[in-house]
Amino acid sequence: MTHSVEDIKSTSRRLRGSLEQSLADPVTGALREDDQTLIKYHGSYQQDDRDIRDERRRQKLEPAYQFMIRTRTPGGVISPSQWLALDGIATRYANHSLRITTRQAFQFHGVIKRELKATMQAINATLIDTLAACGDVNRNVQVAANPLRSQAHATLYADAARVSEHLLPNTRAYYEIWLDEERVSGSGAEDEPIYGDRYLPRKFKIGFAAPPHNDVDVFANDLGFIAILREGQLLGYNVSIGGGMGASHGDAETWPRVANVIGFVTGDQLLDIATAVVTTQRDLGNRAVRKRARFKYTIDDHGLDTIVAEIERRAGFSLQPAQPFAFAHNGDRYGWVEGEQGDWHLTLSLPAGRIADTDTAAHLSGLRAIAQLQMGEFRMTPNQNLVIAGVPAEQRAQIDQLVAQYGLDAGNLAPTALARGAMACVALPTCGLAMAEAERYLPDFSAALQPLLERHGLAQTPIVLRLSGCPNGCSRPYLAEIALVGKAPGRYNLMLGGDRRGQRLNTLYRENINEADILAALEPLLARYAAERDRHTDEGFGDFLHRSGLIALPPYPTHRHLDLELLA
């Protein structure tokens, strides 16, 4: 019998279900159906290798079940020792690779069921956990990865960690199932003051941004905190609500949305406002139709003013007026940069966030060698790249030698700025929702675009490119200047017109087309951009498309862009 997600949550005994029995079943590599939902809250998804699914079916074998495990690493900061431990886990239990996500977490792929518990224990031994990395709860909290402003970053990171801890599910299930914590009387009846019996209607995402950099794409988050800095001092945060990327092809009842800025709070009000926002979504969100369950639809269905008033009522105070701020871009800066405290930070471009040893670069081995130096820290960026941070000036040469030896700067040396900054979700072969390739197709598509960019003198012009294997939008494609959203194998929707700041949604330009048609559609647009763009303002491709009337805002019924006058 198939149970609804809401029923599974409410009867799970605080996320326990029958997970222990599923894990102990030697007959199958899969979990029981209800437990496949519950394990998400513990930080894992059951998947199978879709490349060999048909062959296994012909052989009358069950699918090649495996598990993806995602870490909870608020702000994406870990120590060299933790890096080495995670590297060892990837080599021993997973598919010999690590993957940096767009939310600054790690993903391990290819873990089999009988090694799932040992893998979880190994991760926790590093003082990193996976609780609430997935599921209808608050997910990993993003933080701006700006390495220049060390003091401001430290404050943002600390605040994000506070919010992350505060919004964790209150259950011992995780520790009982994975870490063999002794069960006590009343297990399964813990008080859950924030989430209640049914948790949230859908996933919930929070990001902390530090203007002028919007690397977290804060307006794609359900709840955003935009740091207001004056002369290096953090005054507090502007609050934004209602962002979200997911949609369904051809369904006018679903759409991506850019968040609204609703006011300003001080640092000591963070937990109260976060709790108020989350519980408002808990109680008012749509639990009957999951595709309409995200917070963005709650806002659109009830009205922004109604939701803001409810948030203020629950918080016990009124929001102050939003403070002026401005974003310049949402990308990363590659290579070495000097921090405000005199140390140095090296940003490496990692295509689609994949860390593995390949024919072109030995990222897994090379980063292991750097971690063994035990200096600084590793910071994952929301653009799936990596910052080796806090390097003393006298040790830069040692890092440079390892970078050259292992080819770690292969991404930094990509022939186009577009390729250096592109993002893609995992998609095939492991994601069950993927309709087309994304991560595996990104290098080929970037290479196919290269001649067009070079022909028009745009090779070193930053253009935001993102690929997604399905319309759920894990790579935040709807904010990109150019996006491919998978429709079927080898076919994509071409979306155009986002901007470099993460403030405007793009628009469907061509539907369900192949690579040749995509390139043919882009050629005349890139030619006009090269010839007619405003070079005095460094006009972006998406901005040019709108100024020239070549594209309009998308026809979604609600918030499609952030009004620039709010940023004055």
Swiss-Prot record:
- Its Gene Ontology biological processes? cysteine biosynthetic process; hydrogen sulfide biosynthetic process; sulfate assimilation
Q: Which family does it belong to?
A: Belongs to the nitrite and sulfite reductase 4Fe-4S domain family.
Q: Does the keyword 4Fe-4S apply?
A: yes
Highest taxon above the source species? Bacteria
Q: What is the lineage of its organism?
A: Bacteria, Pseudomonadati, Pseudomonadota, Gammaproteobacteria, Lysobacterales
What role does it play?
Component of the sulfite reductase complex that catalyzes the 6-electron reduction of sulfite to sulfide. This is one of several activities required for the biosynthesis of L-cysteine from sulfate.
Which co-factors does it depend on? siroheme; [4Fe-4S] cluster
Q: What gene codes for this chain?
A: cysI
- What InterPro entries would the database entry show? CysI (IPR011786), NiRdtase/SiRdtase_haem-b_fer (IPR005117), Nit/Sulf_reduc_fer-like_dom_sf (IPR036136), NO2/SO3_Rdtase_4Fe4S_dom (IPR006067), NO2/SO3_Rdtase_4Fe4S_prot (IPR045169), NO2/SO3_Rdtase_4Fe4S_sf (IPR045854), NO2/SO3_Rdtase_FeS/sirohaem_BS (IPR006066)
Q: Which organism is it from?
A: Xanthomonas campestris pv. campestris (strain ATCC 33913 / DSM 3586 / NCPPB 528 / LMG 568 / P 25)
User: What Gene Ontology terms describe what this protein does at the molecular function level?
Assistant: 4 iron, 4 sulfur cluster binding; heme binding; metal ion binding; NADP binding; sulfite reductase (NADPH) activity
Entry binding sites for siroheme: C474
Question: GO CC terms on record?
Answer: sulfite reductase complex (NADPH)
Entry note: cofactor: Binds 1 siroheme per subunit. Binds 1 [4Fe-4S] cluster per subunit.
> Which Gene3D superfamilies does the record match to this protein?
Sulfite Reductase Hemoprotein, domain 1
Q: Could you tell me the EC number(s) of this protein? A: 1.8.1.2
Q: Which UniProt keywords apply?
A: 4Fe-4S, Amino-acid biosynthesis, Cysteine biosynthesis, Heme, Iron, Iron-sulfur, Metal-binding, NADP, Oxidoreductase
Q: Where does [4Fe-4S] cluster bind?
A: C425, C431, C470, C474
Return the protein name: Sulfite reductase [NADPH] hemoprotein beta-component
SUPFAM superfamilies reported in the protein's UniProt record: Nitrite and sulphite reductase 4Fe-4S domain-like, Nitrite/Sulfite reductase N-terminal domain-like
Pathway assigned to this chain's UniProt record: Sulfur metabolism; hydrogen sulfide biosynthesis; hydrogen sulfide from sulfite (NADPH route): step 1/1
Record's catalysed reaction(s): hydrogen sulfide + 3 NADP(+) + 3 H2O = sulfite + 3 NADPH + 4 H(+)
Q: How does it assemble?
A: Alpha(8)-beta(8). The alpha component is a flavoprotein, the beta component is a hemoprotein.
